[in-house]
């Protein structure tokens, strides 16, 4: 009976051995490279009194989960849902963006072993020192409002990228969703925004952008563009995803 039981348990035991081996290999890989999450929506939950220093079931990313998953860098974003493009609504969006960015900084400052970062050298140094890095981005150029000077203000705060739009057209460009093709791509203001982002060293993020906006920005930008959270349309036919040409 014992021998037969041992035989029955061998496949399960072997699976545990294989899992442990794969985990050890994954740890070696993660220890040798910098792992970076380019877009994290955790700040959307700040108003629900979440604590990033503790595991929270509401969050996909918090600091304990980063450590357990060997994630070195998380780019936490100030997300702005698209609203009206009136001066008043635009100013409110700008104020909300500054508020969220400041709160990210405050929460990181109170977390042991977690630091804000902006440049690649900082990310690699923090990894060597065993620290987690948090970068900050903005999801929706609606945050810029109608004032181009806000681009430089965001850059001085340490923002690394701005996603030009979200779901719905704004003053900068047309969106891949809920679009009336208001501009037919980038607006004149949008071109100024891209050029100012280039000047200030901010990455131009084209996630959520319409194809026309994508190619206009690609033509306008003097630096490489990014899509921080998009996938392949050939794999999943969704307006938000990128064609093979893109």
Regions picked out by a protein language model, each given a short descriptive name:
Residues 1-181, 237-246:
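N-terminal hydrophobic targeting/anchoring segments and the immediately downstream early-domain regions
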Residues 27, 146-156, 178-226, 239-246:
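Histidine/acidic residue-rich metal-binding segments in metalloenzymes
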Residues 35-42, 209, 227-230:
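Histidine-centered catalytic micro-motifs
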Residues 80, 231-232:
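Acidic, glycine-rich active-site loops and adjacent beta-strand->loop/helix elements
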Residues 211-212, 232-234:
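Short, catalytically relevant binding-site loops at active-site mouths
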């Amino acid at each position: 009976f014992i021998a037969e039981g041992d035989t029955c348990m061998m496949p399960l035991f072997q699976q545990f051995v294989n899992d442990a081996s794969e985990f050890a290999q994954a740890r070696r890989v993660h220890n040798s490279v910098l792992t970076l999450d380019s877009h994290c929506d955790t700040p959307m939950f700040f108003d629900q009194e979440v604590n990033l220093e503790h595991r929270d079931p509401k969050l996909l990313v918090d600091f304990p989960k980063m450590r357990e998953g060997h994630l070195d860098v998380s780019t936490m974003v100030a997300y702005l849902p698209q609203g009206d493009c009136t001066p008043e609504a635009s100013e409110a969006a700008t104020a909300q963006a500054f508020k969220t960015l400041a709160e990210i900084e405050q929460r990181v400052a109170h977390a042991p072993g977690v630091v804000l970062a902006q440049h690649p050298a900082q990310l690699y140094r923090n990894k060597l020192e065993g620290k987690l890095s948090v970068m900050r981005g903005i999801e929706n150029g609606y945050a810029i409002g109608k004032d181009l000077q806000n681009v430089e203000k965001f850059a001085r705060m340490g923002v690394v990228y701005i996603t030009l739009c979200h779901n719905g057209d704004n003053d900068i460009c047309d969106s891949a969703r809920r679009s009336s093709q208001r501009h037919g791509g980038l607006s004149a203001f949008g071109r100024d925004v891209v050029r100012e982002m280039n000047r200030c060293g901010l990455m131009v993020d084209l996630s959520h952008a319409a194809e026309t906006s994508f190619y206009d920005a690609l033509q306008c930008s003097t630096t490489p563009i990014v899509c921080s959270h998009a996938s392949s349309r050939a794999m999943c036919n969704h307006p938000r995803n990128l064609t093979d040409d893109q």
